[in-house]
From Swiss-Prot:
The gene is yydH. GO terms for cellular component: plasma membrane. GO terms for biological process: proteolysis. This is Putative peptide zinc metalloprotease protein YydH. PROSITE patterns: ZINC_PROTEASE. Binds 1 zinc ion per subunit. Zn(2+) binds at residues 106, 110. Induction: Transcriptionally repressed by rok. It is found in: Cell membrane.
Length: 252
């Protein structure tokens, strides 16, 4: 089915696999099945024109995948050859600055990719996923009113910015500065990005997977699709496992 859109002063509605409704007054979002719309109602809808072509979308995915593969290959080589010792406070300063810069640019990537599609973010914040794992986040409720491909781009763009930046910096570093501190920062942040790609713990990988499969996460646990439930259970298991290990480490 083609992507359809309807908008008036009260509501914004997008139709793709499901019916997504934004109540402009309350700021609430709703999701209904396709059969909730009558043929008469569908006559009021217009074709939704995506801002990026399918060709550009797949080119974007391919380039991001290539950056990830090259990053991972280089990371494995470095892990086999670089010393794991942290040399003094200067290295720690570089690593901290490296992380802060990448975290800020990551969230800006989400924000400005959403703005590119004519939508706005809700808020930026800090939270504990499953009450254990710390994470910065940008609330992107307006992605509900984007097409599937556009949602994927928004959720992936933070990672795209990170891989583009750290791969470029590491390439320059290898041929010029040969700074072990920069390489160590590259290794640590690359490992962090791997966790963000794995579709668990409310990661970007998790949001990309849900967008790809046209699924959503609901606040009521039992309402969710079995795949979402499985991922949530794995997340709870990881959280419990981490807490137990931290307690054992402190006690011992």
């Amino acid at each position: 089915m083609k992507i359809l859109k309807y908008e008036d002063e009260k509501y914004e509605v997008l139709v793709q696999n499901n019916v997504f409704i934004k109540d402009k007054k309350s700021g609430e979002y709703y999701k209904n099945s396709l059969n909730s719309l009558s043929d008469k109602q569908l006559l009021r809808f217009k074709m939704y024109k995506e801002k990026v072509s399918p060709k550009f979308f797949y080119l974007f995915l391919s380039f991001t995948a290539l950056m990830f593969i090259l990053n991972y290959i280089h990371l494995i080589k470095l892990q086999n050859g670089l010393s794991s010792v942290f040399y003094g406070w200067k290295m720690w300063i570089i690593i901290v600055i490296y992380f802060i810069m990448n975290i800020v640019l990551h969230e800006l990537g989400h924000i400005y990719s959403l703005k590119f599609f004519g939508k706005n973010f809700d808020k930026v914040g800090f939270k504990l996923n499953f009450y254990v794992f710390p994470a910065f986040y940008v609330q992107l409720n307006e992605t509900y009113m984007l097409s599937r491909n556009e949602k994927i781009i928004v959720h992936l763009f933070g990672l795209f910015i990170n891989y583009l930046l750290i791969n470029t910096l590491e390439l320059i570093n290898q041929f010029t500065f040969s700074s072990e501190a920069l390489t160590m920062a590259f290794m640590l942040f690359s490992s962090t990005l791997l966790w963000n790609l794995i579709p668990i713990l409310n990661s970007d990988g998790y949001k990309i997977l849900l967008a790809f499969l046209s699924l959503d996460e609901y606040s009521r646990f039992k309402t969710n699709h079995w795949l979402v439930l499985t991922i949530q259970i794995i997340g709870i298991g990881l959280a419990v496992n981490s807490v137990v290990h931290w307690i054992l480490y402190i006690v011992n």
